[in-house]
């Protein structure tokens, strides 16, 4: 039974499904809202998400409104690609990032998601979710998207793309951020 409906601004159907899977556990229905979120170049996904939420609340009337920004932060690359992950994925791809990691022993990395909620009263709430892990030596698996085939979450031997949706919707950075958002939605 659905107790609440929210709108999720994204152009990525994979993210829409992941967020829907997470929030459905809290009886929250996610309605994808087509449109581009306006982004700034910033050093943190939180800054990008906050700016995008401020802009989205001016352009869209639907409430509550959700959006997110996320990034892969690789320790040996001083946090790169971080908030530029989408651009790096589109231009360099998995192989390009792996090339940057050639000969690098320190494979530690983390995915960070900043989920933004524009509430009924137009107040903005930002919640952050993180998952620690490491960069694999080659792409593995076909169940994910983005950098999932090269990210092995801490405590696992498989990449996100090998683990699949059932595990990812419990442990991913996006799942962790939106589980926190669910508490705000339940209390509204």
UniProtKB/Swiss-Prot annotation:
Reaction(s) the record says it catalyses: XTP + H2O = XMP + diphosphate + H(+); dITP + H2O = dIMP + diphosphate + H(+); ITP + H2O = IMP + diphosphate + H(+)
Enzyme class of the recorded protein, top EC level: hydrolase
Cofactor(s) annotated in UniProt: Mg(2+)
Keywords from the UniProt entry: Hydrolase, Magnesium, Metal-binding, Nucleotide metabolism, Nucleotide-binding
Residue sites binding Mg(2+) per the record: 39, 69
The keyword Hydrolase belongs to this UniProt entry's keyword annotation: yes
One GO term describing the cellular component: cytoplasm
UniProt cross-references to NCBIfam families, sorted A to Z: PRK14821.1, RdgB/HAM1 family non-canonical purine NTP pyrophosphatase
Name of the featured protein: dITP/XTP pyrophosphatase
Organism: Ignicoccus hospitalis (strain KIN4/I / DSM 18386 / JCM 14125)
């Amino acid at each position: 039974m659905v107790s609440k409906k929210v709108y999720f601004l994204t152009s990525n159907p994979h993210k829409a499904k992941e967020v829907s899977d997470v929030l459905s556990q809290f009886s929250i229905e996610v309605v994808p809202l087509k449109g581009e979120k306006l982004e700034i170049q910033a050093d943190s996904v939180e800054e990008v998400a906050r700016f995008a939420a401020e802009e989205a609340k001016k352009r869209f009337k639907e409430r509550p409104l959700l959006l997110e920004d996320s990034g892969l932060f690789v320790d040996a690359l001083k946090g790169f690609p971080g908030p530029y992950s989408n651009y790096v994925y589109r231009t360099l791809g998995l192989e390009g990032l792996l090339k940057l990691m050639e000969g690098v022993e320190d494979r530690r990395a983390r995915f960070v998601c900043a989920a933004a909620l524009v509430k009924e009263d137009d107040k903005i709430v930002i919640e952050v979710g993180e998952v620690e892990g490491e960069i694999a030596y080659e792409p593995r698996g076909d169940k994910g998207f983005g950098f999932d085939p090269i990210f092995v979450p801490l405590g696992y031997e498989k990449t996100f793309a090998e683990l699949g949706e059932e595990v990812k919707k419990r442990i991913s950075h996006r799942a962790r951020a939106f589980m926190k958002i669910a508490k705000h939605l339940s209390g509204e």
